[in-house]
Amino acid sequence: TEENVTGIAMTPYTPQGKSLPGLRRNDTYYTSLPTNSVQAVMINKIFVDKAETGAYGLQPVWPTTLAHELGHYLGLFHVFSGGDNGQTTDYCEDTPDYDRPAYDTWLASVYRPTFAQAAQRQDRNGTTFTSYNIMDYYYSYRDRITPDQRARIRHVLDYSPLIPGPKIAVENMSRAEIIIEEPLILK
């Protein structure tokens, strides 16, 4: 429901010749921005003036939500997986992947953990780490990206035609205006 969603973002697409794993590919290139399809980041107005309260104090929700959603808009994915499949979900080798449902279970079992304790995770190899990544959820410092994430962002900025800014030319691309139907929306 909208009361539970703090923000959403559309992910970019990259040209066929310069694609990135996990992102949509297209073999055409926009010559101008479409008028009936908007690539955007949205923050739920319910959360703009709201602060999370709890054992860790009062913290505004929207600044980290905005940074997180901008990460999606620039080609980043969550740094956790949803269960037993053991698959890294963000296509970045330098972000530790952890099992989010297992973390949820652990967190629910601990009586009033400190923020530092709640920010601890165990990766798929059993190694404990502290969550600092902006693409994480829950209790995390959420103030960093990794070099691989930076490289993905740079690639999207250089090649994705719907992100403003100068682009690196891609050979053998048609210059037709095409509207992408059903953009991928991440929460």
Regions found by a protein language model. Name each.
Residues K18, R121-R124, R175, K187:
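Surface-exposed charge patches in extracellular/virion surface proteins
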Residues T1, F129, A151-H155:
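Extended N-terminal export/anchoring regions of large proteins
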Residues D49, T53-R144:
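The catalytic-center signature of Zn2+-dependent metalloproteases
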Residues I8, F115-A118, I168, R175:
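Residue-level detector of intrinsically disordered, flexible termini
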